[in-house]
Amino acid sequence: FKPFVYSAAIEKGYTPGTIVNDAPVKFGRYSPKNSGGSYAGPITIREALYRSRNVVAVKVLHAIGVDYARSYVQRFGFPAKNIPKDLTMVLGSGQATPLQMARGYSVFANGGYLIEPYIIDRIYNDKGQLIARTQPLVAGISAPRTIDPKNAFIMYKMLQDVIQYGTGRAALALGRSDIAGKTGTTNNQKDAWFVG
């Protein structure tokens, strides 16, 4: 969920070059940790994203406000009921299906437009006659623009850095220059995935 919160921060005036101190912090009884327990000190949010620094993400969310961020991330198609009302939201503690995540990330790739994914394009009857066809929302034509195109571009570039320099380097094996996305893991590395 880090990219969605960073997008909200960009909307509030942050830039990829905004520096946040990656250092231990406590918010009441909550003390976020980075994977591996290390800290990088002052770091740009761009680098914090591609290195997947949890503490920086939580600090950014705290600075922009949980309520604002919850409202903002709904622009990516996530239902409010599945978005936590606390700082753990940025670390992916809510509920989202893989399809919802793909739809959310597509906003960055589509210039800020929220499309509706579909699986079935056409249905034919037993006589070969077309009986139904999907009419999807098309980015730039019928889909709603839910974030500023500059924001979408900045986030797309930041997500490309995840592939070039960060935790998603394995995707370089595909030999494509347009890949952008984010890795994700659960506590204790039980589950891992990539979306983008």
Predicted regions, residues:
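Conserved catalytic neighborhood of penicillin-recognizing serine enzymes
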Residues: Y14-A69, D86, L114, D126-I154, ...
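A penicillin-recognizing enzyme superfamily signal
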Residues: F1, Y50, T97-G196
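Soluble periplasmic/extracytoplasmic beta-strand elements of cell-envelope proteins
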Residues: I19-N21, V90-G92, R122
